[in-house]
Amino acid sequence: MIKSQKEYLERIEYLNTLSHHYYNLDEPIVSDAVYDELYQELKAYEEENPNRIQANSPTQKVGATATNEFSKNPHLMRMWSLDDVFNQNELRAWLQRILKVYPNASFVCSPKLDGVSLNLLYQHGKLISATTRGNGLEGELVTNNAKHIANIPHSIAYNGEIEIRGEVIISKEDFDALNKERLNANEPLFANPRNAASGSLRQLDSNITKKRKLQFIPWGVGKHSLHFLRFKECLDFIVSLGFSAIQYLSLNKNHQEIEENYHTLIREREGFFALLDGMVIVVDELDIQKELGYTQKSPKFACAYKFPALEKHTKIVGVINQVGRSGAITPVALLEPVEIAGAMVNRATLHNYSEIEKKNIMLNDRVVVIRSGDVIPKIIKPLESYRDGSQQKIMRPKVCPICSHELLCEEIFTYCQNLNCPARLKESLIHFASKDALNIQGLGDKVIEQLFEEKLIFNALDLYALKLEDLMRLDKFKIKKAQNLLDAIQKSKNPPLWRLINALGIEHIGKGASKTLAKYGLNVLEKSEAEFLEMEGFGVEMAHSLVNFYASNQEFIRSLFELLNPKSSDTAEEKQKSSSVFSDKTIVLTGTLSKPRQEYAQMLENLGAKIASSVSAKTDFLIAGENAGSKLALAQKHGVSVLNEEELLKRLKELD
C-alpha cells in the first residue's frame, strides 16, 4: 500500500527500472506476479489521487523503448497494452461495467500467449513491414527477420491496407531443443521462451532467426478498411488469408461461460504447445468497442485474465549471486531439481536480500517454488515446519562476486558500482555511446562486443585510444566504416556536461537529474550527500548513489573529464531555452494530435518545459488536439492558456 507522494514517486522509479530490465534488456529482475502486485498498488494510489499522476508513471506508458540496433518505425494505429484482472471479483466488476450499459454484449476469449507482439503491415497484398510493439506508438523494424518466420505469409489475398497483429512465440519443444544446442556449444542459455523469442526476432543476422523455429499467432488488427461487425469475424478472416488459427478460442455471453473457459485453459496449460500466462477477453461487437474507447494506456473493451502461478516444493542447496547489466546483484537459489509445468527447475530467483530477510528464507530450507506466468521460477516462502537444524542464514555479500569490488548496499538492492567490472562493462559502454549520453554514431552493442572480444577496450577511456588498424580487425569493417567510427568517437569530445554525467550510468541518475547536476558546474560530482539533498528533486537514494559512485570511481572520472573536457553548459541549447516562451513552464498535452504526444513532449522538454499529465491551477499551457475532453474544460476553468496544434507549431517555428 502506497501512503505518500514520496512513496509513489519511489514506486514509479522502481517499476520503470523493472520494466527496462524486462522489455529492453531481456533481463527480468522480479517475477510477473511481483511486478503485477506493485503495479496494482501504484494504480490504486493514482485512482485515489488523479491530480498527482506523473507523466513517467508506468500506467501512462506501453511496453518498451526501441533500442538502437534497428531503425524505429511508427504504427499506423497505436498498439495498446491490456489491463489485467486477477480473480473472479475483479473480472465480475470489469464485466459489469460493460454489461450495465451494453447488456447484450458478447465476449471473445482466447489463450494469452507469452511472447513478443508484432505488427505486420500489408499493402496491395504484399508484406511491407514488420514492427515490434515498442512503446505502442513506434517499435523496431524487423521485417527481414519476420520474413523468416515460416507461418507469416509474404503475400495475402487482400489488396487493402491492413495491419495484422499477433504474438511471436517459440514452442516449449523447440525452446528445449534450442537450449540444448546452446548448452552443447557452451553458449548462455535463454531464461525462458519469451526471452528466446525476443532475442531471436531481434537478431542482426536474419539467418539466425530462420533457424530458431519461431511462430506467429495473430490476435487482432490495427489499421484496416474491413467491413465486419464483429471481432471474431476479423479473426476468422485473418485465418482465411493463410495465418495460423488461435487454439481454444471461444465466444461467451456471461461471467459463468467465461469462467468455465478460463478453467479449461488452466487445465490444458501444462500440455499446451506454448507458454500461456492467462486468457484474453475482448468485446466481440465492434460498434461497442468503438463506443467504449480507450484509457491513456489500454482499451476499455478488453482485458487479460491472468493465470495463478504454478507451485511445487523443493530444497535450497546453495545460493549464487549474479551481476546484472546495471550492476544490480541478484541472489539465485540453487534447488534440488523439480518439474513445474513440463520444465525442470533447478534455480529460482530470490530477487534481492531485502526479500530474503523479509521472508526469512534460509539455506537448506524446503521452500514453495512457483513459475509466475509460467516463466520465471520464484521462491514464495520457506516451509518452516520442515526445519531440522541444518539451516543457515543467507548472508548479503559485501564484495562483487566478479570483480571483488565493495558493493553499494541500499534498502532493497545491492549494486556493484565498479565501472570496470567485466559483468557490467559492456552495457555501461553501450549506455555511454547512446543517444541520450554521448551519442556516438555507429558504436552499437554488437561493435562494443567485438571490441571486448578482441581485447581492444576495457572502459570508456579506451575508446579514445582506438586506431584505424584496431577497427579493421572487426567483422564487416572496411576503411570507410572504420574511419567514420573514429571520427564519431572524436566528435564526442567537449560534450555538454549533462551528457557526460548521464553517460556515466550512475544508479538513480537519469537525463533530467544529469541536467540539474550540470547547473552546478564541472566539480558537481565532488559534492557531499547533504549538498546533493539540497538540490531540487533529489532524494536520499540519489544522493547516496552519487557519493558512493564518485568514491568508487574517482580516478576514472577525473581522467575521463580531463580527456573529454566537457562544457559546463550547452551554450546553444541554453540560449534557445532561455529565449523560449515554454522555458520553465508546466505543459499538459491532450486529445488527438498529428504526431505522437511524446514527440511533442520531447520538443517542449528540449525548450525547457516541464511536461505534466494532469491539469491544475499551476499548469501554464494546455496543448489541445481533437477530442480534448475533460482536460480542456478543466484548463478553461483554471484560466490556463490553451493552444491548438496549429498554434503550437507556429510558436515552435518562431523559435527555430
UniProtKB/Swiss-Prot annotation:
Entry-linked InterPro entries: BRCT_dom, BRCT_dom_sf, DNA_ligase, DNA_ligase_AS, DNA_ligase_CS, DNAligase_adenylation, DNAligase_N, Hlx-hairpin-Hlx_DNA-bd_motif
Catalytic residue positions: 112 (n6-amp-lysine intermediate)
One of the protein's GO biological processes: DNA repair
Keywords: DNA damage, DNA repair, DNA replication, Ligase, Magnesium, Manganese, Metal-binding, NAD, Zinc
Reactions listed under catalytic activity: NAD(+) + (deoxyribonucleotide)n-3'-hydroxyl + 5'-phospho-(deoxyribonucleotide)m = (deoxyribonucleotide)n+m + AMP + beta-nicotinamide D-nucleotide
Chain positions recorded as Zn(2+) binding sites: 400, 403, 416, 421
EC number, UniProt record: 6.5.1.2
Name assigned to this protein: DNA ligase
Lineage, uppermost ranks: Bacteria, Pseudomonadati, Campylobacterota, Epsilonproteobacteria, Campylobacterales
Role description: DNA ligase that catalyzes the formation of phosphodiester linkages between 5'-phosphoryl and 3'-hydroxyl groups in double-stranded DNA using NAD as a coenzyme and as the energy source for the reaction. It is essential for DNA replication and repair of damaged DNA.
Keyword RNA-binding attributed: no
Family designation: Belongs to the NAD-dependent DNA ligase family. LigA subfamily.
Name of the gene encoding the protein in the UniProt record: ligA
Keyword DNA repair belongs to the record: yes
